[in-house]
Amino acid sequence: LGAVHSMSHALGANQELRLHHGTLNGVILPTILRFNRDHVGDKYAKILRAMRKDISADLADEIEQLNKEIGLPNGLAAMGVTEEMIPDLVAHSMTDPSNATTPRLPSQEEWEKLFLEAM
């Protein structure tokens, strides 16, 4: 689950936006794939192989392309998320139980950057 779900849970808690959890996961996934890239061993190569992609491809780029093909929003901003929301989102994400399964636990500053990158 990891950081993708931590961010999705934080965003899903916003009752004004009423965002779909699965869509959030898809939109956020490329950002977290990049963040974790150097901490996952050969797992990305295995996923790329299962996707029938060259293992030297960038998995985050491949997921972004897939997201585009299936019509997902191109970022959190397209879903109504604003930069003003980030401090609350970070606070929620930092304490989410899904962090127990992340290969790389972000610091507060890294959480902020991750939300900005996912915008």
Task: Give residue spans per PLM region.
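Active-site segments that bind and position negatively charged phosphate/pyrophosphate groups
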Residues: 1-62
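C-terminal charged capping/lid subdomain of soluble metabolic enzymes
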Residues: 44, 50-119
